[in-house]
Amino acid sequence: TDKDWNTIIRYFQYIDSEKISYRGEFAFDNNSTEYHAGEKLHELGACNNCHFYGEEFPTQEASTWAPNLALTKERLNPEWVKEWLRDPQAIMPGTKMPAPYLPDKDILAMDGAEDDWGEELVKLGGDSTAMLNGLRDYLWDIKGKTNIDATIKEYFDENGYEFGAEEDDFEGEDDWGDDEDW
């Protein structure tokens, strides 16, 4: 939600002692080894399972949906994105967002690693900072419509607002415990 994103933004502003949100244009090289390694990490991580890309819907059901990645460059500081990717749970405990798997140098040195991980990731030799830089740069380059409120509303108007119930759900209980606990 916007509230969650604004909480994350305020957190990063706080740790950076930043009072203003304006930042100059972030430049990256979309032909670099880091960028292409980030693209591969993105592909392997299946970010599109949960995240929107402009008006492109996630591949999983609505209960797993996460923010529109086309908003990354509009809302966030590039360094914040790296820290978020490094350990989302440290910043927002309980978030569904997993940290991306970053293969270490031993994994990338194995026979067949280039086939599994791609040439660019192998070239980085397990450098996690370079991998996170590349993933951040790739996310920064995602294009698409940023305000998709009407698209999402239309989806729910057509498909309803119900999320699938668990088989073990009881009458009057949601997936977070008894309603009276709230």
Which sequence ranges carry the predicted segments?
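Gly/Gly-Pro-rich "capping" loops immediately C-terminal to redox-active cysteine motifs
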Residues: 1, 52-84, 96-110
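C-terminal capping alpha-helices of c-type cytochrome domains
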Residues: 1-28, 101-173
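Long, ordered, helix-rich scaffold segments
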Residues: 31-35, 41, 70-74, 99-100, ...
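Long, low-complexity, intrinsically disordered segments
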Residues: 171-182
